[in-house]
């Protein structure tokens, strides 16, 4: 009886297993294959990226079922009643990033044929990471890309040249345009301002130049704007203050000039602001920073702003990093910086004309990992404990302040940093006694005159 029950259970299990296999097999067989035009275009792109790999023999079947990592498909139904749609390539990522993203590897001779991308009507993402490093490749004309594209990414391609050409405004679905560390040049086309779905525009580390005349008013969804390390010039774009969703603004290492736009105070969600190393001048540290409570990092170094450090820190307790190096600051460091900036990790005030003492409150900045006060006119005793100095180590930079001093106990502690370059505070003065001797003729004569005068008074 037990044997019969066991046999019955085994038969039932086998039946369901067979049914599952048949269902899966039927599903696979019933799925439509990727069309030949897209399949062939993928092969050709892979071969242009790395011709040493036999892509066709490694992946001879439907690329929507078996494809290299980085090639992704999705199924699209032409009507709501269809259970299985038509497959299309939706993502292509090239260039090995890591073991977690083993995209098809590129070679120094990788190239690209932009005409091939017209074969992909549902392409959403296109990424090239460190692919074009030796062979010169011209940036593809945007007119070859379909309006379905949401992400266009080129990172670390020094041989990628040319400009943003074509009718870029046709990419109406574009959310992220990331061109970082390439050799793309020219000006930003006005058509970028029509990409109303854009959330990230990163053009850093290229050779763009000219004034930024881009109309930003329509980019209501923009969260990241990074134009750093290019050759942009002129005034900073005035409409920046209208980008209400902006979280990061980086214009550093360009040739922008004039005053820092006051309408930046309208960026209530902004967390990262970097305007360092431009030509902004004679406007002081912006007072409107006090009206931007979401700020976590603000870097203004390398601009001749001038003036004193303002008292604006009581509403900015969340700030983690402040860069005010080489901006022409004068006057004292306000103690309010130490009182309110309790979460501060980095503070750069070096290469200015600051004077007075380092505020005692700085000694209580427990989160600081780097503090640079080099090359100012600071004086007096440093307010740091041995524990503080040991924690910050070599990133506590105090050199170039001749009148700054450290206590002997702090100097003798086994801590690193620039304390060893400071003079000792309260160095004891050893009195110099002059003994009366035959060699001290001037002093001897003086005492004799006093003695004679005393006798004269007594008489």
Stretches found by the model and what they are:
Residues 173-175, 181-199, 204-223, 228-247, ...:
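Tandem repeat domain/solenoid detector
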Residues 131, 157-158, 182, 203-206, ...:
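Consensus "Asn ladder" position of solenoid repeat domains
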Residues 2-6, 10-77, 90-99, 130, ...:
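Surface-exposed cap/linker segments adjacent to membranes
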Residues 111-115, 136-143, 161-166, 185-190, ...:
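The feature encodes a structural signal of leucine-rich repeats
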Residues 129-186, 190-205, 209:
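Right-handed parallel beta-helix
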Residues 79-162:
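LRR N-terminal entry segment and analogous cap-like coil->beta motifs
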Residues 267, 271, 280-283, 289-297, ...:
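Membrane-proximal ectodomain caps of single-pass cell-surface receptors
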Residues 119-123, 142-149, 157, 169-174, ...:
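Leucine-rich repeat
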């Amino acid at each position: 009886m037990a044997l019969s029950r066991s046999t019955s259970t085994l038969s039932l299990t086998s039946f369901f297993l067979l049914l599952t296999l048949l269902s899966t097999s039927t599903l696979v067989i019933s799925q439509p294959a990727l069309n030949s035009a897209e399949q062939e275009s993928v092969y050709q792109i892979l071969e242009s990226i790395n011709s040493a790999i036999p892509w066709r023999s490694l992946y001879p079947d439907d690329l929507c079922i078996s494809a290299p990592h980085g090639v992704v498909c999705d199924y699209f139904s032409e009507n709501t009643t269809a259970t299985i749609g038509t497959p299309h390539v939706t993502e292509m990522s090239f260039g090995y990033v890591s073991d977690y993203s083993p995209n098809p590897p590129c070679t120094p001779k990788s190239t690209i044929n932009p005409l091939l991308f017209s074969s992909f009507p549902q392409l959403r993402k296109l990424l090239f990471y460190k692919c074009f490093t030796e062979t010169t490749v011209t940036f593809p004309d945007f007119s070859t890309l379909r309006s379905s594209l949401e992400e266009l990414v080129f990172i670390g391609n020094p041989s990628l040249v040319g400009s943003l050409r074509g009718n870029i405004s046709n990419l109406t679905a574009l959310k992220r345009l990331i061109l970082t560390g390439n050799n793309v040049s020219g000006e930003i086309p006005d058509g970028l301002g029509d990409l109303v779905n854009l959330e990230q525009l990163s053009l850093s580390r290229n050779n763009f130049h000219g004034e930024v005349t881009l109309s930003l008013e329509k980019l209501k969804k923009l969260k990241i704007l990074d134009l750093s390390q290019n050759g942009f010039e002129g005034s900073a774009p005035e409409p920046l203050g209208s980008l209400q969703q902006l979280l990061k603004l980086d214009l550093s290492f360009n040739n922008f000039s004039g005053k820092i736009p006051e309408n930046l105070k309208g960026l209530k969600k902004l967390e990262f602001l970097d305007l360092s190393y431009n030509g902004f001048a004679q406007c002081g540290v912006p007072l409107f920073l006090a009206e931007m409570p979401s700020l976590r990092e603000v870097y203004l170094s390398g601009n001749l702003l001038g003036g004193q450090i303002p008292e604006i820190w009581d509403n900015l307790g969340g700030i983690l990093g402040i860069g005010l190096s080489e901006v022409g600051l004068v006057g004292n460091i306000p103690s309010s910086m130490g009182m309110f900036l309790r979460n501060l990790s980095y503070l750069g005030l070096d290469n200015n004309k600051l004077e007075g003492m380092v505020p005692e409150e700085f000694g209580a900045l427990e989160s600081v990992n780097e503090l640079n006060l080099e090359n100012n006119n600071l004086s007096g005793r440093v307010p740091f404990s041995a524990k503080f100095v040991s924690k910050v180590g070599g990133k506590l930079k105090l050199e170039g302040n001749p009148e700054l001093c450290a206590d002997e106990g702090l100097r003798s502690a086994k801590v690193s940093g620039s304390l060893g370059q400071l003079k000792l505070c309260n160095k004891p003065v050893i009195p110099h006694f002059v003994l009366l001797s035959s060699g001290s003729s001037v002093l001897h004569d003086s005492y004799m005159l006093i003695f004679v005068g005393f006798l004269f008074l007594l008489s």
